Amino acid sequence: AASDVYKRQSLNQAGALVHVYTDGSVRLNHGGTEMGQGLFTKVAQVVSECFNIPIDYVHISGTNTDEVPNTSATAASSGSDINGMAAWKAASVIKKRMLKQASKVFQKSPSSIEFRNGLILSGNKSMTFKELAFSCWENRVSLSSTGFYKTPKISWDQEKFKGSPYFYFTWGAAVSEAIIDIDTGESRILRADIIQDCGSSLNPLIDKGQIEGGFVQGIGWLTCEELYFNPEGKLLTLGPSTYKIPGSRDVPPEFNIKLLENAPNEEKTIFRSKAVGEPPLLLAISHFLALKNAISMASETSNADLLNAPATPSKILAAVYNDHSM
């Protein structure tokens, strides 16, 4: 959890509901909200991995408090951590029941039975996941379960300002190359090299996309997203026509992203992964500092200390020409 609100233990919990049907399909519902960040895909992967079935078998229904009540906000980069673990717990309960039924069918001990790519194997005997699901139904074995997870090892006393509000920390590093026009104050990012600690990534492709998006969002925060108020305190930058957000031209032409290898999370998160939604935003500070370095190199009289975020053209010109009035 990254924000102050997530120092509340009550928001660090999640539930999930899993059903296995007699045709071998799996239905999943959990408390996380999909907003394009790939959460549903990641949690589906978790269930797929638990049963060792193709992900196509897993069908996710939209977040609904009729199915999983009292959901926590999908915020502070906690979605995969808490919902993924809740889904794993629910699926694990069902798998244990199915394993017990498989041991009766094969007349083998559960320890000798393996779930592998949609098959249930024991020695030279095998059956499909669908066949086992049907066998469970015929023998009145429940194929539904809920799962619940609460983040461990966290506490916070707001009055004493003491405690351990975060389960773990995420690390990253970035190097950026920037260019400025000393006549207009315009700036561009030319290159960014990022390495991000995602633990054992649940989905490297999704995580790289999150890193790209977070970094570009950070560029907007530090270079163009400026608030203007009139003398009466009314906000003037009310929409896209007045509040400038980053566009495709603000993405570095050379954009290199690497996930830290062989660095599983030391804490027992889902598959030893780490949060990746918001941390990369702060790596855009490397671009802001590159702009300050460019200003310092522009002339002997430039004053990079004048540059405050967001680094708009007028602010860059003021720093280049050491003009305190701009």
Residue ranges: model-predicted function:
Residues A1-Q9:
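Conserved small/polar residues in nucleotide/adenosyl-binding loops
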Residues D4, Q45-M326:
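C-terminal catalytic domains of large/alpha subunits in multi-subunit enzymes
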Residues Q9-A14, V20, W171, V251:
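Short, flexible loop/turn motifs enriched in small residues
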Residues T22-N29, K268-K274:
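Glycine/charged-rich beta-loop-alpha catalytic/anionic-binding loops adjacent to active sites
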Residues S25-G31, L190, L205:
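Structural motif
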Residues K42:
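Flexible, small-/acidic-enriched active-site or ligand-binding loops
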